[in-house]
Amino acid sequence: MNLYDRIKPGKRRRGWGGAVFLAAACVVLVICFAPIGWAARSHQRYRRFSTDFAASVESAGKIGAALTRNGETSSLDPDASSRLCRLICAAGAGKVQPSCPQGEPLTVRYHSGAVLDLWEVEIPEETAKNPTGVFVRYTFADGTVYQYDTDQIQMNEVRLALGLH
């Protein structure tokens, strides 16, 4: 008689325990990584906007840009365009919005084909730094639109940067 003859192997249980655990682990992974993917995509879109905007401002320094305000179009000083770019880029990414506000925007048309539209808007969030802010809509030369609002800058700062009083 062998030492191990008295030991009887247990019956193998067939159940859903492993599959349920695997499914729960997959759900947890999706819940954890989906916000990371969303944030990475938002950051990538903002970087594309800021890079293209800076390139448009740089070309405006050589070629020029047009400013439209209250239906009147005038040429935009390269220094003013540069100040506006610094102001908008320093404010950082705002809250992406699906639609534009009503009213006449302050519009800067770059010769690269890009268009920057700015509106003064109310910021309804309680956590907002200021109750009003600026809605930014940037149309790339290929027609793609990136738009957001931010409470980090005010329309009077935009007017000051552009030399409008």
Residue ranges and their predicted role:
Residues 2-165:
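Function-determining sites in protein domains
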